[in-house]
């Protein structure tokens, strides 16, 4: 972090990208500025964004490889120049781009002699290779070579204990960190009481997303971290201000479902699809990934079930509740809907 004195003028707080370039397929660079900030604010924003960029951005990588009957990772395979450990290290370096959630399967199946590169990986449709020229192994003889791979989207650095896997399956220490480096510098402007700061932020990524995309995701994650404090303030409002408002203390889908089961007339809940509820695309996709397709599926879930869904957030919970209240008012729920 660097501080310098520069001349400048006070203006409305704004940010912009002042430099963007692609150094290689696996190295993107972006430089951004945010100004004007009061003294000390640039440090606050810079530190928070740097931590969020390096530790909170999700990435996709290969987490496991299965070779067949290989006694240990230091073994060599006849006809292949690299050892199993070297192949695992090469697979660890493969950069993938995707929006998948959960674990997916991939594979490599080729016949030598030939070089094996990232383009030989057979991937699910939702996954894309950033640099297809990344090396994996060299087959020096005419042999058949197949590997089963496991792909996962996560964040940070994940390690697994090394074991002697008799089925030839070996974990790969996953580095789910699309942001390679972050640096920020602070420039002071003006004199006396008019002094303010400009924050310069530099971001390097591995090509699976652009620096601008990384900055947006990091900012979104920081906002999500502070949302509970805003909700706490709302919950602390006086009873007089809220006595006519209905805010469920918990996501009481299960309680609502119990009430619905008591009624036997009306439209079956399994005939109402979540497509009809006008949910946001993000919430809709979360539910679809969890095989929730109808209102019956949704109301059968508890709050804990929903919060266990990958990428499902507290605000998604509130959005679903508000949507149900909008389209299925309480009197209709009590008098019209049943199984």
From Swiss-Prot:
One of its GO terms (biological process) is DNA-templated transcription. Its EC number is 2.7.7.6. Pfam families: RNA_pol_A_bac, RNA_pol_A_CTD, RNA_pol_L. Residues 264-339 are annotated as: Alpha C-terminal domain (alpha-CTD). It is found in: Plastid, Chloroplast. GO terms for cellular component: chloroplast; DNA-directed RNA polymerase complex; mitochondrion. Keywords: Chloroplast, DNA-directed RNA polymerase, Nucleotidyltransferase, Plastid, Transcription, Transferase. Transmembrane segments: none annotated. Residues 1-233 are annotated as: Alpha N-terminal domain (alpha-NTD). It comes from the Eukaryota. It catalyses: RNA(n) + a ribonucleoside 5'-triphosphate = RNA(n+1) + diphosphate. The keyword Transcription applies. InterPro entries: DNA-dir_RNA_pol_insert, DNA-dir_RNA_pol_RpoA/D/Rpb3, DNA-dir_RpoA, RBP11-like, RNAP_asu_C, RNApol_insert_sf. GO terms for molecular function: DNA binding; DNA-directed RNA polymerase activity; protein dimerization activity. In plastids the minimal PEP RNA polymerase catalytic core is composed of four subunits: alpha, beta, beta', and beta''. When a (nuclear-encoded) sigma factor is associated with the core the holoenzyme is formed, which can initiate transcription. The N-terminal domain is essential for RNAP assembly and basal transcription, whereas the C-terminal domain is involved in interaction with transcriptional regulators and with upstream promoter elements. Belongs to the RNA polymerase alpha chain family. DNA-dependent RNA polymerase catalyzes the transcription of DNA into RNA using the four ribonucleoside triphosphates as substrates. This is DNA-directed RNA polymerase subunit alpha. It comes from Secale strictum (Mountain rye). The gene is rpoA.
